[in-house]
Amino acid sequence: GYMKGDYPVVYNFFRGIRPLVEKFNPQKVYFVLEGNPQFRTQLNEAYKANRVNNDRHFHEQKAQIISIVKECFPFVTVRHPNLECDDTIATMVKVHCEQGDDCTIISSDSDFYQLLNVFDNCAIYNPIRKKMIDKPDYDYVVWKALRGDATDNIGGIPGCGDKTADKLVRSPELLSEYFKKDPIRQQIFERNVNLIRLVDFSDKLSEMERHDGVADFEQLYDILDDMDFQSMIKEKTWNKYVNTFKELL
């Protein structure tokens, strides 16, 4: 993070978004929000149960970020009421990539790596590691279904570590033999594939909640001033900030 203070989450977000827009110079920015998904928890009640965050101040700041983006930035905010953010992003990527657009996902979530297996015109940038992600030379969903995903509370096949998964994912014959030795392995694998594979919901595009934001830099300045983000609204810094987002108008 960039700072500590009353609104560190808000500060980090708005301080971090400008260099990303400047770096990639997009024609359009989608700001995708989480819905109220159910189908994966119906498959596995433990799914993402380890991600509960009861920090009231964090959630208040998250709501502030969403409000500020909608009111002040020329971004397209998208949300489906019943879908995970990941699936909504995957759906938007599919739609645009199939239209011939180049898409860049800004995320540290490795679930998106599977999209690199599908779309040549999709790229992923990890803002934490500050690097582009290389396309896997194997089926990422198969590998992750074997290993599991601790971040989403998805247990892997017992005894299957990185080395075993690396061998199995590259050999259908070895994978078939591996499952024959213990049918429980295949049951865990198939469950995990259903939990990990991002779903194409392009048939639900009409159900997406979409907000086409309009830039309001005067209001944004006042908000940042009220939050005492003085380093962001100094004249030189502020002019650079505004000019970055003017490219999206």
Name each region found by the language model.
Residues 238-249:
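Short, amphipathic C-terminal "tail helix"
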Residues 50-232, 248:
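Extended two-metal-dependent nuclease catalytic cores across DNA- and RNA-processing enzymes
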Residues 1-68:
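Domain-level signal for Mg2+-assisted phosphodiester chemistry and nucleotide/NA-binding surfaces
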